[in-house]
């Protein structure tokens, strides 16, 4: 788990949520540096969550952010399982419906931004609603 120095100088453990939030901020900044525009973060719909929603031109990009300290056991990108993909699809479907859209009417894709150690990997169009 990551640590952060406190005012007293002794490190304090970050919670898993705090660590995840920090990597999501890093991913957002990194993607903005690549020209994407921020739409929303931590979108919750009926038990599912999308880390980031961005726009690239006319495309809505649903982003899953992953972090692993090392590539042992496949690294960050390998941790997006079929089950997780299904949950992301369901959450995106509900979000689109709330915004008067659907997979049939909105150009969208699912990306993964994976941080493994000090490396960042952007996997565009990782999966789709036809996977």
Swiss-Prot record:
Matches recorded under HAMAP family: UPF0102
Region (Disordered): 1-20
Family: Belongs to the UPF0102 family.
Compositionally biased spans, kind Polar residues: 1-19
Provenance organism: Escherichia coli O157:H7
Pfam families in the cross-refs: UPF0102
Recorded superkingdom: Bacteria
InterPro entries hit by this protein: Restrct_endonuc-II-like, tRNA_endonuc-like_dom_sf, UPF0102_YraN-like
GO molecular-function terms, A-Z: nucleic acid binding
Originating gene: yraN
Name the UniProt record assigns to this protein: UPF0102 protein YraN
């Amino acid at each position: 788990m990551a640590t952060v120095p406190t005012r007293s100088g002794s490190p304090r453990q970050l919670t898993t949520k705090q660590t995840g939030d920090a990597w999501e901020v890093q991913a957002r900044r990194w993607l903005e540096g690549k020209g994407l525009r921020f739409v929303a973060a931590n979108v919750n719909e009926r038990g599912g969550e999308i880390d980031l929603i961005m726009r690239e031109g006319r495309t809505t990009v649903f982003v899953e952010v992953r972090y692993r300290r090392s590539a042992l056991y496949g690294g960050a990108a390998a941790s997006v399982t079929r089950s997780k993909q299904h949950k992301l699809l369901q959450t995106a479907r509900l979000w689109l419906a709330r915004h008067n859209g659907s997979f049939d009417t909105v150009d969208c894709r699912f990306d993964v931004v994976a941080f493994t150690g000090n490396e960042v990997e952007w996997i565009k169009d990782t999966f789709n609603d036809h996977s």
